[in-house]
Amino acid sequence: MKTKTDFLKMKEQGEPITMLTAYDYPSAKLAEEAEVDMILVGDSLGMVVLGYDSTVPVTVEDMIHHTKAVRRGAKETFIVTDMPFMSYHVSLQDTMVNARRIVQESGAHALKVEGAGEVISTIHYLTNAGIPVVAHLGLTPQSVGVLGGYKVQGKDAESAKKLIEDAKKCEEAGAIALVLECVPMQLAELISEQLTIPTIGIGAGQKVDGQVLVYHDLISYGVNRVPKFVKQYTSVQEEIVRGISQYVAEVKTRQFPEEKHSFTMKEEECLALYGGKQS
């Protein structure tokens, strides 16, 4: 399993880091088989798995439950778990309780937190307690209400400078990596050059140290539309619907199950059971 040291070395050597979300045993197992470097159990599970309109309703219990499943499916992959909405915008003591629960109960190797400001002290606090932290700047889904929706961040010089400052503060506080979401590629490149920790981009262009996408977006599974920054590498959704539709049709017309899908009794047992009457 790759570690923080490996990711730092990959950045130094210019080897891109691959990260993918996973939310359950099968998706994690497939991600590991595909040799993904890092798995993110994102609070995006609220939208793509649980059917919520945002990540806000996701709880600490949800994150623990799904991370445990992911750990069972990807035992040799570094796993990062999101701290959900309002689980770390509380007192440092309560933040530690939530963080401890997620790490101890789920087996996550690191936690991800969104934003800067007071979150910088949270990163420092958790790091000092021995919990690796991944920071997340740019578009932070838990704060879309404050940001005015899902919009690109850092498009003007002033806000870009603020993001650069925040990125440096995240590193100084002890973050082991930084996710940059929906920021101009020029800004992402500049931030990546000024940090020693890896930057993982999602809608941040090529000049970052790694990329992350949502599992369901990448394979077109249960999603009707995807953001501009997503490339869909396959469409399992069409195959799944086709397969289920065929199953429904064959059951309705009694084509399924066939004899080869059924079990039989020996003739003498049939006679003993109901006098040999067979349907």
Swiss-Prot record:
GO BP, sorted A to Z: pantothenate biosynthetic process
GO cellular component, one term: cytoplasm
Record's subcellular location: Cytoplasm
Pathway in which the depicted protein is active: Cofactor biosynthesis; (R)-pantothenate biosynthesis; (R)-pantoate from 3-methyl-2-oxobutanoate: step 1/2
Enzyme Commission identifier(s): 2.1.2.11
Family named by the database record: Belongs to the PanB family.
Cofactor(s) this protein cannot do without: Mg(2+)
UniProt subunit comment: Homodecamer; pentamer of dimers.
GO molecular function list: 3-methyl-2-oxobutanoate hydroxymethyltransferase activity; magnesium ion binding
Protein's UniProt name: 3-methyl-2-oxobutanoate hydroxymethyltransferase
Binding-site positions, 3-methyl-2-oxobutanoate: D43, S44, D82, K112
Binding site for Mg(2+): D43, D82, E114
One family name in Pfam for this protein: Pantoate_transf
Gene encoding the protein: panB
Disulfide bonds: none
